[in-house]
């Protein structure tokens, strides 16, 4: 049976998030999601009189490419993607995953090379298109959240089909508070962290770039972060599962990092000179995320 919520979500992404208009070229990027998701997005773009361009991806295929990746190979792929992105007005990505740790055995050196090669493509998308990215609910994600698949799907659509425009007043108030905040002090079990926001403006996010949404974000003054923070929720990064993450800061830099996989997290933090510094601090007005929020399933930027 067709789920009408898929059509609702597609229309929201097209009409509200990316505001597709007549003649807009829209890249629809689907990763491990059912074909009917791409079909719903195509129809929504056509309804808006846009021009859909579709790419379908499979994580197993991508993993194999990365494991055997060469610089020459990804120079070609990166150029191909960048050239196409320069032709686009809008970009919508829907990312599912049958196995959230599928890329866990891709060598870190290979992963870092691929990410570096693809960075100009991502920068073009972020800076020069109207874009929105989101996850697609899968059994793998439901398992991570400790929920049944149907219950997780209901949760997903509940938070993704919000009237995000109605959140703007509350988010505006939060933005004003963050704009005038000079220092943040976070305390909790295993956590005592301080940093400055002085002189840095917050940005309110109302369902335009990431779904689900409802946050205001800023960034700490680079060298102001001091103390320790411990995370009570698991996360997946580059296909590797991390839990019990603890970070210690001095003069803004992570000087010690431990987790269930301490070696892997430090390899990531050593991948470039900026990786040991915090790039974002955010507060959310999204109160509908309850215990399910333990699952780290928000989209990548």
Q: How should these model regions be labeled?
A:
Residues 33-34, 97-99, 138, 200, ...:
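Short, glycine-/Ser/Thr-/acidic-enriched flexible segments
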Residues 36, 240, 297:
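Residues that form or flank phosphate/diphosphate-binding pockets in enzymes
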């Amino acid at each position: 049976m067709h789920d009408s919520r898929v059509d609702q979500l597609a229309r929201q992404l097209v009409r509200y998030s990316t505001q597709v208009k007549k003649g807009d070229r829209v890249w629809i990027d689907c990763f491990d999601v059912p074909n009917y998701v791409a079909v719903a997005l195509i129809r929504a773009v056509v309804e808006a009189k846009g021009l859909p361009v579709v790419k379908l991806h499979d994580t197993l295929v991508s993993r194999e490419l990365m494991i055997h990746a060469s610089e020459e190979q990804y120079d070609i792929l990166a150029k191909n993607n960048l050239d196409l992105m320069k032709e686009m007005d809008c970009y919508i990505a829907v990312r599912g995953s049958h196995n959230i740790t599928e890329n866990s055995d891709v060598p870190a050196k290979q992963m870092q090379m691929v990410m570096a090669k693809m960075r100009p493509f991502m920068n073009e998308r972020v800076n020069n298109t109207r874009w929105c990215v989101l996850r697609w609910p899968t059994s793998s994600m439901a398992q991570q959240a400790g929920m049944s698949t149907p219950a997780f799907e209901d949760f997903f659509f509940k938070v993704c089909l919000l009237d995000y425009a109605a959140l703007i007043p509350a988010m505006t108030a939060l933005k004003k508070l963050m704009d005038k905040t000079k220092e943040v002090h976070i305390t909790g079990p295993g956590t005592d962290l301080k940093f400055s926001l002085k002189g840095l403006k917050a940005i309110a996010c109302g369902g335009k770039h990431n779904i689900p949404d409802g946050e205001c974000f800023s960034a700490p003054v680079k060298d102001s972060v001091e103390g320790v923070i411990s995370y009570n929720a698991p996360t997946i990064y580059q296909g590797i599962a991390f839990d019990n993450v603890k970070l210690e800061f001095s003069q803004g830099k992570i000087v010690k990092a431990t987790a269930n996989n301490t070696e892997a997290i430090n390899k990531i933090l050593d991948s470039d000179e900026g990786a040991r510094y915090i790039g974002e601090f955010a507060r959310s007005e999204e109160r509908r995320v309850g215990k399910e929020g333990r699952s780290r399933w928000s989209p990548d930027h």
